[in-house]
Amino acid sequence: VTATIVFDFDGTLAIGHGPVMAYAECAAPLAGAQYLERVETALAEYDAGGGGYRDGYDVVGSLAAADGVEAAALSDAYARSRDVLGTPEAPVSAVEGIDEILESLGRHARLVLATNAPAAGVYRVLDSWGVRERFDAVHFAVGKPAGLTPIIRLALEDGPVLAIGDIFEFDLAPAVALGADTALVGATASTSPESVTMRGQTIAELRPDIEAWAASAASSTPAPEGASPRLER
């Protein structure tokens, strides 16, 4: 049995609004008056559990679209912001103790990074954290939610799977549909009505639960088909 933990990147491993504000800066020349101020206000509301936005990138895109910015222009703004990911123009913060956490989990589970983001800048960030080699596989431009399904399905052939992310619809719903376990982190963790295996503000907060899951999963025997007992913590 080989357990697998599938991590999202933005909002899960990479936290803070630096990359989001870099995206907003690139979109601002095309948007309306006081756009950046409106983005900052909406981000604060999102962080407090309100606003109804999917994540920070949704805040930036939605407000720009409401100002008449076309999808193609927003896509270009996003791409330009990712080119500077991990630089002073788009600073990224890591989950506290990320290297130790990944090192610990890697003793018991295969670690996979699966993100909708393009590769641009991500390896630079992982290298700056010293964790690039902690991952057994890395998938970019996955096309979640649908694109996550084959990754989860393949991992389940080897053993238990835990998907970790900050957007239930994209990062966790495909895992739930296949019977895998899930961990919801980020601003929506405390308010989301979705049923998940565990939830917390950050991976660091959930570290004991995730480590316990990994140790248990690594020593487990395959469950009978259709059996998926799960308790939310």
Describe each model-derived feature in a short phrase.
Residues 1-2, 99, 103, 112, ...:
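Asp-based, Mg2+/Mn2+-dependent phosphohydrolase catalytic module
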Residues 1-41:
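Active-site neighborhood of HAD-like aspartate-dependent phosphohydrolases
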Residues 20-28, 57-61, 119, 123:
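An amphipathic alpha-helix signature
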Residues 40-51, 60, 148-155, 162-165:
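Structured N-terminal alpha/beta-domain signature
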Residues 41-87, 99, 103:
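A metal-dependent, Asp-based hydrolase signature
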